[in-house]
């Protein structure tokens, strides 16, 4: 076999070839457009790029929920309420009593199973409907199972009552135009005091405090989010709204624009769903489709991110089609835990990932974009004056 003579020149050519290959491989491995870059994590990379000219979108895939992510550098933090003047009780799972504004008030505290003292969790405030109470929300909302599986703390207030002036209608929570500012402030202070005591005694994620209400509880939630947007990260309004008939209007949330879910149970004829989400008590006829759309108008004008959900079952418990293994309202809790306080106005991880699988098909990002639920399978009808 013929073999080329071994020379210094050939050694030099071989060395240059090896150097060229090494250079090409090196350049290719650092190509930022290469899909396999995810296989080479950079553990020392900063957790926030808020100072960069074009910051990356929030990532809800690296963590189960965005509220699990580390607090970004220079993140905007919520205001923190002062401790109640009468002090805090020793909080425990179950019923708790507190003195707020000189009155004795109560609430349920739900902790997840195996809650460790060092575990930092989001807090969800849950406001019940007219015919229900705090325990009804706990049971029908499957809140304990949800807290165990999704890892959050829940505070379920007990209502003091709120009667519409000139009627005997007790809406449980103050939201109507006959409620004086002093009554509204009393309920806002109750929220402040519950939150302050939770912050004092529990390791809570202060950037992930949300308010969620159903029917009358949603109507109050929609007032609370305006009054305490400097403390609340997000909201979920399930058959709520503003401005219709006797409901107080939308006046805005100020500098912080909390993202929210706006859900209702139908627009009625002549719309395609054929059912109307209406509370026809004492001839007042509050229409939650009108009230919800009125709130959407205010939210859009002010620059909030919203998810709109429309079902076709009227004023009943939402017919949420939850994936197997998850609690009934898992998608609503998930929304709250994916929208921390530090998100910029109008920002959401859902704009990058789309809605999660737990969210009903009749929900969509943005006002007017949802396709109403169709078909049967609605929950049993309830007395609209009781739900």
Give the residues covered by each predicted segment:
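Structural recognition of the beta-strand scaffold that forms the well-ordered cores
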Residues: 107-108, 123-127, 152-158, 208-213, ...
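Bacterial signal peptide processing site
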Residues: 28-31
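The feature captures the conserved acid-bearing segment of alpha/beta-hydrolase catalytic domains
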Residues: 230-322, 327-330
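A domain-start/cap signature at the N-terminus of enzymes
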Residues: 33-34, 41-43, 49, 53-123, ...
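Sec-dependent signal peptide recognition
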Residues: 13-21
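Serine-hydrolase catalytic machinery in alpha/beta-hydrolase-like enzymes
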Residues: 89, 100-108, 119-207
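N-terminal secretory signal peptides that target proteins for export/translocation
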Residues: 1-14
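C-terminal motif of bacterial Sec signal peptides marking the signal peptidase cleavage site
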Residues: 24-26
């Amino acid at each position: 076999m013929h073999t080329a003579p071994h020379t210094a020149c050939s050694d030099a050519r071989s060395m240059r070839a090896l150097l060229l290959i090494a250079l090409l491989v090196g350049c290719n491995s650092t190509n930022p457009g290469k899909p396999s870059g995810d296989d080479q994590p950079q553990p020392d990379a900063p957790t926030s790029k808020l100072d960069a000219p074009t910051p990356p979108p929030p990532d809800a895939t690296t963590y189960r929920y965005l509220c699990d992510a580390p607090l970004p550098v220079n993140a905007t933090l919520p205001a923190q309420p002062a401790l109640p003047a009468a002090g805090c009780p020793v909080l425990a799972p179950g019923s708790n009593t507190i003195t707020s504004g000189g009155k004795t008030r109560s609430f349920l505290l739900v902790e997840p199973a195996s809650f460790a003292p060092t575990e930092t969790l989001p807090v969800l405030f849950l406001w019940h409907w007219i015919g229900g109470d705090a325990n009804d929300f706990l049971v029908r909302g499957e809140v304990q199972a949800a807290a165990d599986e999704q890892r959050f703390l829940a505070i379920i207030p007990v209502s003091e009552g709120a009667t519409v002036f000139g009627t005997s209608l007790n809406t449980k929570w103050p939201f109507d135009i006959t409620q004086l500012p002093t009554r509204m402030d009393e309920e806002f202070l109750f929220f402040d005091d519950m939150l302050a005591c939770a912050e004092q005694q529990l390791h809570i994620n202060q950037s992930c405090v949300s308010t969620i209400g159903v029917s009358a509880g949603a109507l109050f939630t929609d007032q609370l989010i305006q009054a305490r947007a400097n403390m609340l990260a997000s909201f979920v309004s399930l058959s709520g709204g503003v401005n219709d008939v006797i409901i107080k209007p939308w006046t805005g949330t100020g500098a912080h624009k909390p993202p929210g879910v706006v859900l209702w149970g139908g627009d009625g004829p002549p719309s395609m769903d054929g059912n109307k989400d209406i509370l026809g008590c004492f001839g007042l006829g509050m229409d939650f489709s009108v009230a919800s759309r009125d709130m959407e108008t205010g939210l859009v004008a002010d620059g909030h991110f919203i998810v709109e959900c429309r079902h076709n079952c009227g004023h009943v418990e939402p017919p949420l089609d939850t994936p197997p293994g998850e609690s009934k309202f898992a998608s609503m809790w998930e929304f709250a835990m994916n929208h921390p306080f530090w998100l910029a106005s109008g920002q959401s991880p859902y704009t990058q990932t789309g809605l999660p699988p737990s969210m009903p098909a009749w929900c969509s990002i943005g006002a007017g974009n949802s396709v109403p639920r169709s078909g049967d399978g609605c929950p049993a009808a309830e007395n609209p004056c009781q739900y």
